[in-house]
Curated annotation (Swiss-Prot):
The gene is murG. GO terms for biological process: carbohydrate metabolic process; cell division; cell wall organization; lipid glycosylation; peptidoglycan biosynthetic process; regulation of cell shape. Pathway: Cell wall biogenesis; peptidoglycan biosynthesis. It comes from the Bacteria. One of its GO terms (molecular function) is UDP-N-acetyl-D-glucosamine:N-acetylmuramoyl-L-alanyl-D-glutamyl-meso-2,6-diaminopimelyl-D-alanyl-D-alanine-diphosphoundecaprenol 4-beta-N-acetylglucosaminlytransferase activity. Keywords: Cell cycle, Cell division, Cell inner membrane, Cell membrane, Cell shape, Cell wall biogenesis/degradation, Glycosyltransferase, Membrane, Peptidoglycan synthesis, Transferase. This is UDP-N-acetylglucosamine--N-acetylmuramyl-(pentapeptide) pyrophosphoryl-undecaprenol N-acetylglucosamine transferase. The keyword Cytoplasm does not apply. It comes from Brucella abortus (strain 2308). It is found in: Cell inner membrane. CDD domains: GT28_MurG. GO terms for cellular component: plasma membrane. UDP-N-acetyl-alpha-D-glucosamine binds at T17, G18, G19, N128, R169, S197, Q298.
């Protein structure tokens, strides 16, 4: 523990979903290896995702999501954010962090505003190809911006933006060592259906309906792993049982990276963490962006991977059970195409993103500017 005292404290602030917390966890692992004492500021939703942090290093900060125009609701929201600001100031006075890093989501607003007002260096990481609302609100205040899928050298804050990629957790890096082996035309075909950390109700209905339309000899090849919301779990499992298709259905899989490495084909939403893990592990995918995302960030993430040849992108509105069955059957019978797609996906993966982000974090914590960091990292 002596080296922790030498380096000091860094606080990571992240909204309480896997998309925000998984990259924070990956950065925490890298920073700890460099001798930093890493704490997490988050909201009450985060409990199932924070196993990588010691309990006394997880701090729940009061917050709320800004939504709608109801004046009473807005007043309550801003009151919660103000209380979160007080929570954050109290925490920072005790921990004396050398840096606060935000990973998006409204729960990051109180810690990042408090830190910038207290003169603590700040950095935000934007996982998506389009900046989210919380990060947009912070971009003008922070010392540096790190990007996962943000376009290089674009936007009003290009001068203080560094493209690091999205940090992925250690199990993803382990899974990335498993090469992609296409299924032969008579082999079992392992399908992974993944709706992101919060699940996807659409997949729980559409995938079983599509599988039911496949010819019997194609159904007999399938082995399915599907993440489903708790309220959809039983119905999805029963649908596969009626079809005689082996399926492992659950709301959450702790070993998702290993399951992705084992898959021949992935059908998924296109949140930044999901797309990053697909590219680092290198698996062919059909991406169905969440259609109601306020900033259309999932569509932009999916487009970035599709442009590299690493995925097919289909709008949910266009994905009838019939079309889904046709696309699934095509994937099952074109192993060469899937192998090329897997190679293309892996070619754009950034397995060293955690190292790059940690380098930037240490530079900002030491008082360097982004310009100085960029000059020091030129080949």
């Amino acid at each position: 523990m002596d080296n922790l005292a030498n380096q000091g404290v860094i606080v990571l602030a992240a909204g309480g979903t896997g998309g925000h917390l998984f990259p924070a966890e990956a950065l925490a692992h890298e920073l700890r290896a460099r001798g930093w004492d890493v704490h997490l500021a988050t909201d009450a939703r985060a409990q199932r995702f924070v196993g990588a942090f010691a309990q006394d290093h997880v701090h729940v900060i009061r917050s709320a999501t800004i939504a709608g125009r109801n004046p009473v609701a807005l007043l309550k929201t801003f009151w919660s954010l103000w209380q979160g600001n007080l929570d954050s100031r109290k925490l920072f006075r005790r921990l004396k962090p050398k840096l606060v890093v935000g990973f998006g989501g409204y729960p990051t607003l109180p810690p990042l505003y408090a830190a910038s007002n207290m003169g603590i260096p700040t950095l935000i990481h934007e996982q998506n190809a389009v900046m989210g609302r919380a990060n947009k609100g912070l971009a003008g205040r922070v010392k540096a911006i790190a990007g996962g899928f943000l376009p290089e050298n674009s936007g009003a804050y290009a001068a203080k933006t560094v493209i690091t990629g999205n940090p992925v957790r250690s199990p993803v890096l382990v899974a990335a060592a498993t090469p992609y082996t296409p299924a032969g035309k008579d082999d079992r075909f392992r399908l992974l259906v993944f709706g992101g950390s919060q699940g996807a109700q659409f997949f729980s209905q559409a995938i079983p309906a599509a599988v039911a339309l496949l010819p019997e000899h194609e159904r007999a090849r399938l082995l399915i792993t599907q993440q489903a919301r708790k309220e959809d779990e039983a119905s999805a499992r029963q649908a596969y049982e009626k079809l005689g298709v082996p399926a492992d259905v659950a709301p959450f899989f702790n070993d998702m990276p290993a399951r992705m490495a084992d898959a021949h084909f992935v059908i998924a939403r296109s949140g930044a963490s999901t797309v990053s893990e697909i590219t680092v592990i290198g698996r062919p995918a059909m991406l169905v962006p969440f259609p109601h995302a306020l900033d259309h960030d999932q569509a932009a993430n999916a487009a970035a991977l599709a442009a590299a040849g690493g995925a097919e992108v289909v709008r949910q509105a266009d994905l009838s059970p019939q079309r889904l069955a046709e696309m699934l059957q095509s994937a099952m019978n074109e192993p060469e195409r899937l192998e090329q797609q897997a190679k293309a996906a892996k070619s754009v993966g950034k397995p060293d993103a955690a190292r790059l982000l940690a380098d930037l974090a240490e530079a900002i914590a030491s008082g360097k500017t982004v310009q100085e960091f960029k000059e020091g990292n030129r080949p």
